[in-house]
């Protein structure tokens, strides 16, 4: 962790932290869209206060275990240290903070102390659905997440290659959320297996977090040629094949 502390020290050389604002400059996003308090938790990393760094990171980010692996690191592109050298490795520091939290018990489940008595249904278990469920559960509401597929996670589970985001990382967070009180229901296609009217009757609120699963097609010569697939369809089929292979080490290649 010494390298992360060194990078945290470099962050303190900055006078104007563009990294945390997520502004649009010349039509391009500059800085963190989540408005992560980057200089604050980098400073805590620098001083060795890892638990406080985790608490500060969680103020703005429900899932640093995901973003620290797949985020394009717009914060680093906006880092002023990068004007005269390499930017601060903020993404690596975020990864170090969250993994250190799991290793040392900071990221242990924290069920809400009080329940409000309100019930909320979330339809869809992708990033937005999980974030909504996490926030509502922390506020004491009883949350049930409905997912039409056989595993929780949406594109986190099926759309991102395992080399970028291992399925075990997604499953680890799901277990934490379950222990905090969130209920997950799989193979539940709302509108087909479950009537919307039933949910509206049983829950105080219903959140639609269905995602955008329909791809955009193109009108181009050769589009219908054999071997051309939509990216998400291909990735989803490949990942499902991997998950259903039952190989414990995840080292699975299907040459078909």
Task: Describe every region a protein language model picked out.
Residues 11-15, 87, 172:
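Short amphipathic alpha-helical segments with coiled-coil-like heptad repeat character
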């Amino acid at each position: 962790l010494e390298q992360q502390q060194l990078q945290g020290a470099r962050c303190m050389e900055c006078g104007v932290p563009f990294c945390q604002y997520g502004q649009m400059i010349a039509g391009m996003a500059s800085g963190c869209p989540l408005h992560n308090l980057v200089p604050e938790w980098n400073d805590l990393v620098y001083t060795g206060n890892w638990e406080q760094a985790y608490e500060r990171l969680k103020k703005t980010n429900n899932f640093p275990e995901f973003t620290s692996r797949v985020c394009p690191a717009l914060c680093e592109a906006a880092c002023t240290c990068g004007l005269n050298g390499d930017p601060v490795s903020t993404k690596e520091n975020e990864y170090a903070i969250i993994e250190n939290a799991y290793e040392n018990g900071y990221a242990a489940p924290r069920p809400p102390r009080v329940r409000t008595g309100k019930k909320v249904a979330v339809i869809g278990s992708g990033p937005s659905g999980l974030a909504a469920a996490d926030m509502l559960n922390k506020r004491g509401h009883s949350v049930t997440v409905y997912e039409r597929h056989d595993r929780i996670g949406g594109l986190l589970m099926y759309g991102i290659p395992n080399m970028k985001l291992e399925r075990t990382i997604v499953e680890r967070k799901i277990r934490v959320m379950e222990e905090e009180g969130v209920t997950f229901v799989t193979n539940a296609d709302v509108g087909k297996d479950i009537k919307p009217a039933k949910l509206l009757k049983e829950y105080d609120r219903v959140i639609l977090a269905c995602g955008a699963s329909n791809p955009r097609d193109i009108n181009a010569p050769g589009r219908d040629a054999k071997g051309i697939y939509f990216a998400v369809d291909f990735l989803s089929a490949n990942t499902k094949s991997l998950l259903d292979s039952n190989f414990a080490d995840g080292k699975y290649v299907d040459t078909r």
